[in-house]
């Protein structure tokens, strides 16, 4: 009976979003160079993530992107081009929900990075504000990043790709992934027809719904972009108090349970 309800919900969502999603280009398109001024490229020698500049001194990304040595680039579009206003920073301090850095696919996959010095706003660099309200189910959301554009084999683009995906009720992801808990501080988003998705190396990047920064790319099934398999995003709104408290200097604050 539960399985029947889940399949029915998926069918309803598939039909309700079909027209909207069919307008999209499979896999997304190159982002407009002025569309992602807040998008950070979080990089080590063998690993790459995205991130979001939330003020001149702080970047928000996923906890699973943490590495010992990290470079954070702002103002990048084409990775093979050096831009005049491109800026590189390093983590001065990294903050996690738990001191042990424990996180799961559905809980506490969030990392707040204080940069070694503030970045300067420019034609290609500006911060993205934290959300003022939670997202609404049914929203069309924007994702972006330099992640692979093919899966399971990787094809990495030089420029970030942008695409629109749909925000679903959490129960949709629970129906697809039965191991998810009954309640969680994550968002469920994707395109039920498949073909559009975030993927490897997009982790840590933003999910922007109705112009507001609502999610952090966390986890998705492999291969990416499969039909009826949405991805999981850390819900930024539920972590606002934690983020704002740390920025204000209260570094002992803990994440919501």
Curated annotation (Swiss-Prot):
Glycans are attached at residues 78, 102, 153, 169, 250. Coiled coil: none annotated. InterPro entries: Peptidase_S1_PA, Peptidase_S1_PA_chymotrypsin, Peptidase_S1A, Trypsin_dom, TRYPSIN_HIS. It comes from the Eukaryota. SMART domains: Tryp_SPc. It is found in: Secreted. Disulfide bonds join 31-162, 49-65, 141-209, 173-188, 199-224. Its EC number is 3.4.21.-. GO terms for cellular component: extracellular region; secretory granule. The active site is at 64 (charge relay system), 109 (charge relay system), 203 (charge relay system). The keyword Signal applies. Residues 25-248 form the Peptidase S1 domain. One of its GO terms (molecular function) is serine-type endopeptidase activity. Residues 19-24 form a propeptide. Snake venom serine protease that may act in the hemostasis system of the prey. This is Snake venom serine protease CL5. It comes from Trimeresurus stejnegeri.
């Amino acid at each position: 009976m539960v399985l029947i309800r889940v399949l029915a919900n998926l069918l309803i969502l598939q039909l309700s979003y079909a027209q909207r999603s069919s307008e999209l280009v499979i896999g997304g398109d190159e982002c407009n160079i002025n569309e992602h001024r807040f998008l950070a490229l979080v990089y080590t020698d063998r690993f790459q993530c995205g991130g979001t500049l939330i003020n001149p001194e702080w970047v928000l990304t996923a906890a699973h992107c943490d590495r010992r040595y990290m470079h954070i680039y702002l103002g990048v579009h084409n990775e093979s081009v050096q831009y005049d206003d491109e800026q590189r920073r390093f983590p001065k301090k990294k903050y996690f929900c738990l001191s042990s850095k424990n996180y799961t696919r559905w809980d506490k996959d969030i990392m707040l990075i204080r940069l070694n010095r503030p970045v300067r706003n420019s034609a290609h660099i500006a911060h993205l504000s934290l959300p003022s309200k939670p997202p609404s189910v049914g929203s069309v959301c924007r994702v972006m990043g330099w992640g692979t554009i093919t899966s399971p084999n990787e094809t990495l683009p030089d420029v970030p790709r942008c695409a629109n995906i749909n925000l679903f009720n959490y129960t949709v992801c629970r129906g697809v992934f039965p191991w998810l808990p009954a309640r969680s501080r994550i968002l469920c988003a994707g395109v039920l027809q498949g073909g559009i998705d975030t993927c490897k190396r997009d982790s840590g990047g933003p999910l922007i719904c109705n112009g507001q920064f609502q999610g952090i790319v966390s986890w998705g099934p492999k291969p990416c972009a499969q039909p009826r398999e949405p991805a999981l995003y850390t819900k930024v709104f539920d972590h606002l108090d934690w983020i704002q408290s740390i920025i204000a200097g209260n570094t002992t604050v803990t994440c919501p349970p």
